[in-house]
Regions:
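Alpha-helical scaffold segments
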Residues: 2-277
Length: 277
């Protein structure tokens, strides 16, 4: 070897290696483990997906820091999943709610989380415009399944303020004040009322109320459903029948779900109009 090359070798020094962040043994290299002295208060605002996921999984994370982390609208799905598995922290009410409604929470995380929410948290999930439709529907289904076990006062509040689908289920409540509150719900729909009237049971309070309702009793599909309901007051049958178009009267007659009195009322209307049944 030449003297010059030996001098070059002796004069050359290798740059010190930069230490890599600690990793989880035997797992994906992207799953960073935070050092013991990590400042979680700063790291929750980091832009690195790997750091945010590591923060979400850290056992030292507090409720306030978890909520700050969940304020990231672009929080990685991996971070949301890690947070949902973070022990007691993931069971806290506010954290659960924030995980359930976060736009990037995977469905296999959000739907099971929803099942553990409180009644009025479920109501909020179903009402928030930012929540995906399938997540809203899951919240509504859980809420409807709980109706039989929650208090009368809670059902009144739900009847007044919940989504149209939940209010629709409360149309068949055994308490008149709850049924009336559901009927007046701003999100109540004609479809929900017709569905409730066709339930076949539990309409003893609903049918008379709808038959005299200033808004809903004038809808043709509602009138048709009332004519097919055994609980519709007899003094309203002829008026409802008289207001229906001929084609709808014939459809109702063909349905075969009429009481004798309702059928006779419809036939009388057709006869008066000179139309054969």
């Amino acid at each position: 070897m030449s003297e010059s090359s030996t001098d070059e070798k002796e004069g050359w020094q290798e740059a010190p290696e930069q230490p890599e962040p600690p990793r989880v043994r035997g797992d994906s290299p992207r799953k960073t483990v935070l050092p013991a002295d990590a400042d979680l208060g700063k790291l929750v605002h980091d832009s690195s997906p790997e750091i945010l996921t590591a923060v979400a999984a850290d056992a030292r994370l507090t409720e306030d820091l978890a909520l700050a982390l969940l304020n990231h609208q672009d929080l990685p799905r991996e971070a949301l999943e890690a947070l949902s598995k973070n022990g007691q922290l993931a069971r806290l009410r506010k954290v659960r709610m924030a995980i359930a409604v976060h736009p990037r929470t995977p469905r296999h995380v959000s739907v099971p989380t929803i099942r553990h929410l409180y009644t009025f948290d479920l109501m909020q999930v179903a009402l928030l415009p930012s929540v995906p439709p399938d997540v809203k529907r899951a919240a509504e289904e859980v809420l409807i399944s709980k109706l039989a076990s929650i208090s009368s006062g809670e059902r009144v509040t739900l009847a007044r303020r919940s989504s149209g689908r939940v209010a629709g289920a409360l149309l068949l409540d055994k308490e008149e004040r709850i049924m009336q509150a559901a009927l007046a719900n701003p999100q109540m729909t004609e479809v929900s009322i017709v569905k409730a009237l066709k339930a076949g049971h539990g309409t003893e309070l609903l049918a008379p109320a709808v038959a005299r309702h200033q808004k809903w009793s004038y809808r043709n599909d509602v009138k048709a459903a009332l004519l097919g309901n055994k609980d519709t007051p007899s003094d309203r049958l002829i008026h409802l029948a008289a207001e229906l178009p001929i084609n709808l009267i014939k459809d109702v007659l063909r349905s075969g779900r009429l009481t004798t009195q309702a059928k006779n009322s419809l036939l009388a209307v057709l006869e008066k109009r000179g139309v054969k049944a």
